[in-house]
Curated annotation (Swiss-Prot):
Presence of the UniProt keyword Transferase in the record: yes
EC number assigned by the record: 2.7.7.60
Stored InterPro entries: IspD, IspD/TarI, IspD/TarI_cytidylyltransf_bact, ISPD_synthase_CS, Nucleotide-diphossugar_trans
GO molecular function: 2-C-methyl-D-erythritol 4-phosphate cytidylyltransferase activity
Alphabetized Gene3D superfamilies for the sequence: Spore Coat Polysaccharide Biosynthesis Protein SpsA, Chain A (3.90.550.10)
Gene transcribed to yield this protein: ispD
Domain of life of the source: Bacteria
Positions bearing the site annotation: Transition state stabilizer: 13, 20
HAMAP family attached to this UniProt entry: IspD (MF_00108)
Native species: Prochlorococcus marinus (strain SARG / CCMP1375 / SS120)
Protein name: 2-C-methyl-D-erythritol 4-phosphate cytidylyltransferase
Catalytic activity reported: 2-C-methyl-D-erythritol 4-phosphate + CTP + H(+) = 4-CDP-2-C-methyl-D-erythritol + diphosphate
Length: 226
């Protein structure tokens, strides 16, 4: 299976002056923990890392540390643009691709394998977890105007897996129609293309804020203790 790792983000919401994937958590970089899970999966045979040129040296050194090989792909100004560029960097024979946020360092290796299996069966798939909080829609002036049915709500995660050619077609349509999406499942949704949910662990968080870093540190440290 081909895997694209999104690593072109910044550390703005983290309050850091560097890419959050380079920050230390439980003694290692965020990205190193993610790569450790990739390495322990059974399905990943090719890795592309989509990042900013300014981070290339640091990120490549983490791959060396983890004894993994990857193709470097320069990312864009948004996640959407970075995925487009990542698709251009895939090998010509790539039929399926998993896309994973490099900041989801708590991902379990088996999740890559389960997504890969569904994808090989012809099913577009995303990892997700049921929402446990009650979700409110709020007006601009702060008043509640709708409560959603929690039973129908899932929090989207990664990996997300798609047929390569179909995903390329989707991104072309997005460019033509000037659509902006925050993940590729949203793009498929706009086009009416089915995507299946694969339930994953609530621990598969995206490390985005200082609080996330504390949670990740505690969970990764506890895994080591076990």
């Amino acid at each position: 299976m081909h895997l694209l790792i999104a690593a072109a983000g910044s550390g703005k919401r983290m309050g850091a002056n560097c890419n959050k994937l380079l920050l230390k958590v439980a003694g290692r970089s965020v990205l190193a923990w993610t790569l450790d899970a990739v390495k322990r999966s059974n399905s990943i045979s090719w890795i592309g890392i989509v990042g900013q040129p300014s981070d290339k040296e640091a990120i490549v050194s983490i791959f060396d540390e983890c004894a993994l090989q990857a193709k470097w792909i320069n990312g864009g100004d948004s996640r959407q643009e970075s995925v487009q560029l990542g698709l251009e960097g895939l090998p010509l024979d790539a039929k399926h691709v998993l896309i994973h946020d490099g900041a989801r360092c708590l991902v379990e290796p088996e999740l890559f394998d389960k997504c890969s299996e569904m994808l090989r069966q012809g099913v577009s798939v995303i990892a997700a977890t049921p929402v446990i909080d009650t979700i409110k829609k709020v007006s601009l002036d702060g008043f509640i105007n709708k409560t959603f049915n929690r039973a129908e709500l899932w929090a989207a995660q990664t990996p997300q897996g798609f047929n390569v050619e179909q995903l390329r077609q989707g991104h072309k349509k997005a460019l033509v129609n000037n659509w902006t999406v925050t993940d590729d499942a949203s793009l498929f949704e706009k086009l009416g293309w089915p995507v299946k949910i694969l339930e994953s662990s609530p621990s598969n968080i995206k490390v985005t804020t200082p609080f996330d870093l504390l949670i990740a540190d505690a969970l990764l440290s506890s895994r080591g203790a076990d």
